[in-house]
A protein has these predicted regions:
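Polyanion-binding surface elements
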Residues: 209-231
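Residue-level detection of the helix-turn-helix DNA-binding "recognition helix"
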Residues: 239-240
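Short, solvent-exposed cationic patches
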Residues: 33-49, 161-181
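A short, Lys/Arg-enriched interface patch at domain edges and termini
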Residues: 189-205, 258-265
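Broad phosphate/nucleotide-binding scaffolds in NTP-utilizing and phosphate-metabolizing enzymes
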Residues: 1-117
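DNA-contacting interfaces and partner/effector-binding or oligomerization modules
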Residues: 111-165
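Short helix-start
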Residues: 244-265
Length: 265
């Protein structure tokens, strides 16, 4: 993951933090809570008005795209050759230009550490999510909070019915990049902060954990299928501590699905 500070050159104000997950080509922008509709980047003002400071990945990527040379530019091949690029890459162009464009005074600067406000906010990100019966989500968060949430109760989530009314879409649900959402069909993102804010700390029962084991613990073969890799690749990741088994067996290890997915980020 690469981390960039978004800074206003005129005021020197830290305007946001851009997280770029290179393996998936996914961007997430975190905004400081001191921003208002006048100091926030124009594209994000509607979110700031609603007190939403974690920008969805599609809107974050749109911010990147708006600041770089479009892929349809007539001389794009010459530009790619000039920068020794084999293919069009929005983030590469953003780094080359330092994120500067004519529409505002913002620029980006690569940093090594996440600011405290981002670290604190990420404690509400999702680690594991179990798709239980009756469209109920069992969500495990970074700060050890566990919530059991019925999709029908998320009235503020506009795309709720697209998930509820299509069982195939519902069953496709998984933890999204960085734990920022539960994503369905890779096209509908249910934000982690929205799930965390639900008043639903319902006591768990044994069946909840049985469902968890059934759906979220993978053996070596299932993990290889999910990552589309060989057993040798799996062994390499374990040796390099990129992946930690929850149980080691001679015939094959067991892994948490969330840990396996994180190797793709």
């Amino acid at each position: 993951m690469k981390i960039f500070a978004i800074i206003d050159e005129e005021t020197t104000l830290l305007t946001g933090i851009l997280l770029y997950y290179e393996k998936e080509g996914t961007c997430v922008i975190e905004l400081p809570e001191y921003l208002d509709e006048w100091t926030a980047p124009l594209l994000f003002t509607s979110y700031v008005k609603k007190k939403i400071y974690t920008i969805p990945r599609d809107i974050s990527f749109l911010w990147v795209k708006e600041r770089v040379i479009p892929s349809g530019r007539q001389n794009i091949n010459d530009i790619l050759a000039h920068h020794n690029m084999q293919s069009y890459d929005e983030m590469k162009f953003l780094e080359i230009s330092e994120g500067k464009c004519s529409q505002d005074s913002l620029y980006i600067k690569k940093i090594d550490m996440l600011p405290d406000f981002v670290i604190e906010r990420q404690k509400k990100n999702i680690v594991e999510c179990v798709l239980s019966d009756d469209h109920t989500l069992l969500c495990f968060f970074e700060d050890d909070t566990i919530k059991k949430i019925q999709l029908e109760d998320l009235q503020s989530f506009e795309e709720q019915n697209k998930i509820i009314n299509n069982e195939q879409v519902y069953q496709s649900g998984k933890v999204g990049t960085g734990g920022y959402c539960v994503t369905f069909n890779e096209s509908i993102d249910l934000p982690a902060w929205l799930l965390y804010d639900e008043e639903s700390n319902i006591p768990l029962n044994l069946n909840d954990f049985k469902v968890f084991l059934k759906k979220n613990v993978l053996d070596t073969t299932e993990s290889c299928d999910l990552l589309e890799c060989s057993r040798q690749n799996m062994s390499y990741m374990v040796r390099k501590q990129q992946l930690t088994p929850v149980k080691e067996e001679v015939r094959g290890n067991l892994y948490l699905k969330g840990d396996v997915l994180r190797t793709l980020w």
